[in-house]
Amino acid sequence: MSRKQLALFEPTLVVQALKEAVKKLNPQAQWRNPVMFIVWIGSLLTTCISIAMASGVMPGNALFSAAISGWLWVTVLFANFAEALAEGRSKAQANSLKGVKKTAFARKLREPKYGAAADKVPADQLRKGDIVLVEAGDIIPCDGEVIEGGASVDESAITGESAPVIRESGGDFASVTGGTRILSDWLVIECSVNPGETFLDRMIAMVEGAQRRKTPNEIALTILLIALTIVFLLATATLWPFSAWGGNAVSVTVLVALLVCLIPTTIGGLLSAIGVAGMSRMLGANVIATSGRAVEAAGDVDVLLLDKTGTITLGNRQASEFIPAQGVEEKALADAAQLASLADETPEGRSIVILAKQRFNLRERDVQSLHATFVPFTAQSRMSGINIDNRMIRKGSVDAIRRHVEANGGHFPADVDQKVDQVARQGATPLVVVEGSRVLGVIALKDIVKGGIKERFAQLRKMGIKTVMITGDNRLTAAAIAAEAGVDDFLAEATPEAKLALIRQYQAEGRLVAMTGDGTNDAPALAQADVAVAMNSGTQAAKEAGNMVDLDSNPTKLIEVVHIGKQMLMTRGSLTTFSIANDVAKYFAIIPAAFAATYPQLNALNIMRLHSPDSAILSAVIFNALIIVFLIPLALKGVSYKPLTASAMLRRNLWIYGLGGLLVPFIGIKVIDLLLTICGLV
């Protein structure tokens, strides 16, 4: 369940962002963005020149210089506003999480067992290793592992999902999160973190962006922008002596305006906002990323390791067919299978009862009325069934039933072995039914592949992403399901060691690997993967090993995570293309205006036929500032994303953002020039 989405320009956020934009005018804040720092210096320089002209210290048009100076300050403010708005949206999301943190008291047990003496201590004083007792109505005071008890827990404050979940000692459901509430029963919990290190604390810090660091691609792009800025700075600096030598020196104000319009201020002003917004969009999908690096890596992923159950298939195997052994009627097999499943509350057991009812109208029977005894499934026996009168009926895996038959002096029929093999080849799981020592036949339990999943894998393949299905099934079953689902490869009979080895193999080939996991046994593979999405319902070890946590605990979310990562990279690339294309158009506006008096031949470049040199320069500076504001929604929401091949995506972006970046400035600058002329401002 996703959290409530904030409006793009929430009034309270806009007001706060405007205040923050002004605060960010200090040199220390500006220095972090080298491109905008150059604009900030230019604004300061032109302001000083305007004051000097107004006071008569320097000759020149003080009004024009002041107008240029004002719009340069506006450019810096707009860039600050874009970053502050993105950060404000993240902080607003974090505030909803802060509401979960409550200063409360905890019952710290003196011994690690229920009923032991307890001391009442502030929750924020609990340390790693402390044992606490929580009962119905209590807020869990710390992250930890359940060591005794079982309870229903409301995790909606963290996940946004209203349905309660069961947390109990042992297994993969022992992990609890501080800030969640016990609805029933009790738990004895061992705290796994120190104050300030809880999952909730880390979520708040990550969402607020306090720990946001520039990603490798962001650093590389920043270096490129700095290089372009230095090139244009040197080029602009050499223009003054050239113009002076020509007998009509260009003013410093015009040179500063030229520099600001030529350097990539658009992407420079939006780069931080794009990174912050990427993490914010991930949170909108109920996924917490530990860093911007994790989001960026998601965009570069080219191998997806996907668990079969819950991701590729619906997760609940359904009985699809009764296949009797030689000499056994199908109805007799269905009758025995239904009897063995009457008290089996698993989805598989319920589906067997329903199939027998549909095929042979076997209904209105229950264990109690039949005076029968239900035999539950255990990890040791790997069978379940029923004892009724003198009949002993069992259903279970092939190996378990084979051992059972041989232990009772029977013989496992060869024709049933063939039927088991046939079921496995069709992608179903064989379940064998036996009465006493006589094998009655096989039930085919079919994994239902999710609708539309094959098409999604085809889209991923177009994007150059390889999909690998991970399953504990045997190779025959795995191969059949893989073919039906349309994945590129599969790992059958998967063990934690096999998953880890597979990830390392792909990484050795230079690929980036993404996977999901929820158990402690998944932790080594999660730690190795480039993008590791841990389920919030999983163990503490899994969550610590991953670099993302899915609050919905939905394995399918991995595909959405990759889409969000790719959208962030596309947004950054598209706006960079647009920004650089902008510079070309602004060149045709400013160069003729600035140097036509010295070099009349440059008038040939004045293809926009702007009103005057002053209006041309001012129009370009105004456009340079306004375009940042107009692109803020695109930076925050991301460009529209379609699963395409890399070459098709490049062509599409060059047409839209390259050509658009050339045309929009020509139109925008011309319109602004006309408005300035009509209003008599130039």
UniProtKB/Swiss-Prot annotation:
The active site is at 307 (4-aspartylphosphate intermediate). Keywords: ATP-binding, Cell inner membrane, Cell membrane, Ion transport, Magnesium, Membrane, Metal-binding, Nucleotide-binding, Phosphoprotein, Potassium, Potassium transport, Translocase, Transmembrane, Transmembrane helix, Transport. Its main location: membrane. The chain crosses the membrane at residues 34-54, 62-82, 219-239, 254-274, 588-608, 616-636, 662-682. Gene3D superfamilies: Calcium-transporting ATPase, cytoplasmic domain N, Calcium-transporting ATPase, cytoplasmic transduction domain A, HAD superfamily/HAD-like. One of its GO terms (cellular component) is plasma membrane. It is a multi-pass membrane protein. The keyword Plastid does not apply. Its EC number is 7.2.2.6. It is found in: Cell inner membrane. Coiled coil: none annotated. Belongs to the cation transport ATPase (P-type) (TC 3.A.3) family. Type IA subfamily. PANTHER family: POTASSIUM-TRANSPORTING ATPASE ATP-BINDING SUBUNIT. HAMAP family: KdpB. The system is composed of three essential subunits: KdpA, KdpB and KdpC. This is Potassium-transporting ATPase ATP-binding subunit. It comes from Escherichia coli O81 (strain ED1a). The gene is kdpB.
